Amino acid sequence: MATRHQVRQAVVSLLYAHEMGSEMNEFKDEFLEEKKIRNERKIQALETFDAICLKKGELDEILKPYLKEKDIERIGIVELAILRLGVYEMKFTGTDKAVIINEAIELAKELGGDSAPKFINGVLDALKGEM
């Protein structure tokens, strides 16, 4: 069975592909199967992805005050996907905020640029007190 971390990786990848304009309906099931994300974890990944897509505007509004001088459109797509996932989990799940931040940092190390882990940590750490 896939781990929660693998589910988060898949969600970030799906969010990235969605932002890049991929046709997600044909792609989601095949992608998750390829990553061996099945059963409950597949449902969790799809529900999280769909919820983030639906609430993207709300999540971005929560993020904006914590971006300092950075305009949300100037953030890398991978980093923005990780931030949206982190904000979504903080706001809509019961997962401990320290776990969410740690997972986001790990995702940033794996998928983002060199400065991504520090940036993601700073934004989510500042945000956690408000959530």
From Swiss-Prot:
Looking up InterPro entries in the UniProt record yields:
NusB-like_sf, NusB_fam, NusB_RsmB_TIM44
Q: Sorted alphabetically, which keywords does the UniProt record give?
A: RNA-binding, Transcription, Transcription antitermination, Transcription regulation
* A Pfam family annotated for this UniProt entry: NusB
Top-rank taxon of the source lineage equals: Bacteria
Q: Does this UniProt record's set of keywords contain Zinc?
A: no
Q: Does the keyword Transmembrane apply?
A: no
Q: Name one GO cellular component term.
A: cytosol
Q: Which GO terms describe its molecular function?
A: RNA binding
Q: Biological process (GO) annotations?
A: DNA-templated transcription termination; transcription antitermination
Q: Which residues pair up as cystines?
A: none
| Family of the protein in this entry | Belongs to the NusB family.
Extract the PANTHER family matched here: ANTITERMINATION NUSB DOMAIN-CONTAINING PROTEIN, N UTILIZATION SUBSTANCE PROTEIN B-RELATED
Q: What does this protein do?
A: Involved in transcription antitermination. Required for transcription of ribosomal RNA (rRNA) genes. Binds specifically to the boxA antiterminator sequence of the ribosomal RNA (rrn) operons.
Q: What is this protein called?
A: Transcription antitermination protein NusB
Name the source organism.
Campylobacter curvus (strain 525.92)
Query: What is this protein's gene name?
Result: nusB
